[in-house]
């Protein structure tokens, strides 16, 4: 009796699972794994190193990465092919919110791809100038027991030891505090 039950369930379950991933199976050959990007990233890295007149040793030094962050549009339009509109928007947003991207993260951006996830995470866009949202959507200030300590949950704390970051991500909920 058990063998009959086990014999049927896996076949039915297998068919069900296979059906659920059918769309993935059709597209999986087109999904980049990251290996394909190696040459592009390496090309971008060399382009950046040439632009800032640096070496591979510099590039592998995190101190150099922090010191050499891009904090405005200067150079970015050449390195990642920003349009004139993107360049002026970047400068406008950067005048209101701090902006920085390390050479490493810059090398990951796919030039010319408006939907590049790294670009969206790191390069300011016009939508940041909309003031429709709240400045503190997570009510960090209301949950802060001190300027540098936020306690939203009884069993954990967020301790903000610095207001400096290697890259000011565009989605960061604390960007209103950066530089204070």
Indicate residue ranges for each PLM-predicted region.
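Flexible, acidic/Gly-rich N-terminal and inter-domain linker regions that tether
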Residues: 1-151
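N-terminal pre-triad scaffold of radical SAM enzymes
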Residues: 99-101, 145-173
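Conserved alpha-helical substructure of the radical SAM core
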Residues: 176-180
């Amino acid at each position: 009796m058990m063998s009959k039950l086990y014999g049927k369930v896996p076949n039915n379950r297998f068919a069900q699972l296979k059906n659920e991933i059918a769309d993935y199976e059709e597209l999986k050959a087109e999904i980049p794994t990251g290996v394909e990007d190696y040459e592009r990233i390496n090309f971008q890295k060399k382009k950046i190193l040439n632009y800032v007149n640096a070496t591979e040793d510099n590039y592998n030094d995190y101190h150099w990465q922090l010191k050499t962050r891009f904090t405005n549009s200067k150079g970015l339009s050449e390195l990642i092919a920003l349009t004139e509109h993107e360049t002026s928007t970047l400068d406008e947003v950067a005048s209101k919110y701090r902006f920085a991207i390390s050479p490493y993260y810059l090398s990951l951006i796919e030039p010319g791809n408006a939907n590049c996830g790294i670009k969206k995470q790191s390069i300011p866009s016009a939508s940041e100038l909309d003031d429709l949202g709240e400045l503190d959507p997570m009510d960090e200030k209301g949950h802060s027991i001190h300027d540098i300590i936020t306690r939203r949950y009884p069993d954990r704390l967020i301790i903000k030891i610095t207001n400096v970051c290697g890259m000011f991500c565009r989605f960061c909920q604390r960007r209103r505090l950066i530089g204070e």
